[in-house]
């Protein structure tokens, strides 16, 4: 088994978890055939990296989660490095980091971490796991469920959808920006927020991907 494939599977399961991940869901996430996923899960189970129940899905074991978080750490450090040193846009970072993350040695990982002064979050606002895989507790919520008339600060935006990221960037809806929830459509779940002195309508699908926390005085 190629280590790149193993790392991709483990990282994808971590992203889709923590509950059991269905074979079909994992196949869609990785853009591979369900039969290929089933075979790989069986092999990962034999290696003690996943707990796999046929027809019910799979979840990471403690060993599998540690390996997954190692890849997540590399990926998010690389995104941060590429943004700070090469000034790549947020919509470019994910794909470039995907290509590089499997080739990053532990020594280079430490060097990048030191060079960046041990960053806590990547440019999308996602927490960067520590060297032992430790993650801070999440204290943010999806924008779609944020209370009306309550100020908030955007903490995270999605990293996989370049089109969505491009739109968020164009509207200034990025980590660190301050907003206030103004209205929520009771039918389609879309929201209206006040951002930079203007009203912005955000589709439900986007509002569920953007995460916010308390803060701001908009």
Feature map (PLM): residue ranges:
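Mid-protein regulatory/catalytic core that forms ligand/cofactor-binding pockets
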Residues: 102-209
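Residues within the helices of the helix-turn-helix
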Residues: 23-24, 42, 62, 80
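N-terminal helix-turn-helix DNA-binding core of bacterial DNA-binding proteins
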Residues: 1-32
């Amino acid at each position: 088994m190629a280590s790149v494939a193993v790392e991709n599977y483990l990282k994808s399961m971590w992203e889709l978890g923590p509950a059991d991940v269905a074979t079909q869901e994992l196949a869609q996430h990785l853009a591979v055939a369900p039969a290929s996923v089933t075979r790989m899960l069986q092999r990962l189970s034999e290696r003690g990296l996943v707990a796999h129940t046929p027809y019910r899905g799979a979840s990471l074991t403690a060993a599998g989660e540690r390996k997954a978080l190692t890849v997540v750490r590399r990926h998010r450090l690389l995104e941060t490095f590429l943004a700070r040193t090469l000034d790549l846009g947020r919509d470019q970072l994910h794909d470039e980091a995907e290509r590089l993350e499997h080739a990053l040695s532990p020594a280079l990982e430490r060097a990048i971490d030191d060079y960046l002064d041990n960053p806590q979050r990547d440019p999308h606002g996602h927490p960067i796991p520590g060297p032992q895989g430790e993650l801070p507790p999440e204290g943010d919520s999806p924008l779609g469920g944020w209370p009306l008339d309550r100020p908030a600060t955007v903490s995270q935006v999605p990293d996989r959808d370049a089109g969505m990221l491009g739109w968020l960037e164009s509207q200034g809806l990025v980590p660190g920006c301050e907003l206030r929830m103004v209205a929520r459509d009771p039918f389609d779940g879309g929201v209206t927020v006040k951002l930079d002195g203007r009203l912005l309508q955000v589709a439900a699908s986007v509002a569920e991907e953007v995460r916010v926390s308390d803060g701001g005085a908009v």
